[in-house]
Design a protein with these regions (language model features):
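Conserved donor-binding/catalytic core segment of Leloir-type glycosyltransferases
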Residues: 170-186
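A short helix/loop element that forms part of the nucleotide-sugar donor recognition site in Leloir-type
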Residues: 155-169
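Active-site proximal beta-strand in glycosyltransferases
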Residues: 59, 73-93, 103, 121
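Carbohydrate-associated surface elements
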Residues: 126, 148
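Short N-terminal targeting/anchoring amphipathic segment
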Residues: 47-65, 69, 78-81
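Membrane-proximal helix-turn-helix segments that form the acceptor-binding/catalytic region
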Residues: 88, 101-120
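A conserved catalytic-core segment of Leloir-type glycosyltransferases
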Residues: 1-54
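Short hydrophobic "strand-cap" motifs at the C-terminus of beta-strands
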Residues: 123, 145, 178-180
Length: 186
């Protein structure tokens, strides 16, 4: 996005580099793979100013970024760690009646990323098992890292009880929160 800074340091020695890759809006999820060339070009232009051993580790998310990570990993000899989040094969096995299946090109791209990765991060044991059973990932290279929340940063300013009172929820009510799209595999 044009309003983002070029680089953001999120921790000591950990930077997020924003790359320009295609239009800033108006693309559907299905159209994103068409921007892989633009993403690759943008990264390669950035990377040519760096030595090949600049990175100790690459970590990509979602299959499209994984494709770029695979190429950079092969080019530089840097290990690639990848997090899928969702996969075409799992989604296609659990489609709701009205849902359109994920394209075969995505499944193929995911298979390539799995094979090219030094390690794969899954959020759950079920996700790890699907990487092994559906994508032939080596079980020794799949690591479960459950997502979490920093409760010091993200907590009600005046406590849970006050939040429940504001929302008119009984203090002893059991609460469940779901954040995400409602899909059968989730």
């Amino acid at each position: 996005h044009p309003n983002l800074p070029e680089t953001v340091e999120i921790a000591d020695g950990v930077n997020v580099k924003h790359l320009v890759a295609g239009p800033f809006e108006g693309l559907s999820k299905e159209e994103l793979p068409s921007q892989l060339g633009a993403l690759t070009s943008s990264f390669m232009n950035y990377q040519k100013q760096l030595p090949n051993d600049y990175y100790s580790l690459l970590h990509s998310h979602y299959w499209i970024s994984g494709q770029l990570g695979w190429m950079v990993s092969e080019r530089t000899g840097t290990p690639l760690i990848h997090t899928m989040h969702t996969t075409a094969k799992v989604k296609n096995l659990n489609l709701a009646d009205s849902e359109k299946p994920e394209p075969q090109t995505r499944a193929i791209g995911e298979e390539q990323v799995v094979k090219a990765s030094t390690g794969l991060i899954a959020n759950t044991d079920a996700e790890a098992a699907s990487l092994v059973s559906l994508y032939d990932a080596c079980p020794d290279n799949v690591f479960v890292v459950a997502p979490g929340v920093d409760l010091e940063s993200f907590s009600p300013a005046d406590g849970k009880a006050a939040a429940r009172v504001r929302l008119d929820i009984a203090l002893d009510a059991i609460m469940l929160t779901f954040v995400g799209r409602i899909q059968p595999h989730k």
